Amino acid sequence: MDGSVFEGIQKALVADRYAFFTEFFKNFYNTDLLLGKRVSEQAVQANWNISAGASATACLACVPTWHEDFRNDLTRVDVPTLVIQGDADRILPITASGLRTAKLIKGARLSVVKDGPHCITWTHAEQVNGELLEFLRKA
């Protein structure tokens, strides 16, 4: 992804991290589509509360780790690997991450969660858990 995206995140965190968290979690869960259906307002608020309680310094310092280039490392993975991601991920689009990751890891199994946002472990837990259990049975 373009490095300017991460610079923008850092600027937003410095300017008003609480406002940043509010916007971030809207896209983390795709609340415009899934709020009240697959995620509750309380679950979103609980995540916001955890983020708001985190160190401002740590929140800012973790952003550069999000764009570390691990592509060379992925080509050396030699264990069974499941890559699972939502096709509606607004935080890290599947074309920029999951699809590429699955191609770089030899023999990786790709599972795409239809209409899944970034936090598929919450919004699509049954499907994610089913995929994980099936993968582990075969691994």
Model-derived features: where do they sit?
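Active-site phosphate/pyrophosphate- and oxyanion-stabilizing loops and adjacent acidic/basic residues
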Residues: 71-72, 99-100, 126
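Conserved alpha/beta-hydrolase catalytic His-Asp/Glu region
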Residues: 11-75
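Flexible "cap/lid" loop of the alpha/beta hydrolase fold
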Residues: 1-15
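Short beta-strand/loop motif that positions the catalytic acidic residue
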Residues: 77, 83-85, 89
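Active-site acidic short loop of glycosyltransferases
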Residues: 78-79, 107
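Conserved alpha/beta-hydrolase "acid-adjacent" motif
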Residues: 90-97
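Acidic beta-to-alpha connecting loop that harbors the catalytic carboxylate
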Residues: 87-90, 115-117
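Catalytic active-site module of serine/aspartate enzymes centered on a nucleophile-bearing elbow/loop
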Residues: 105-139
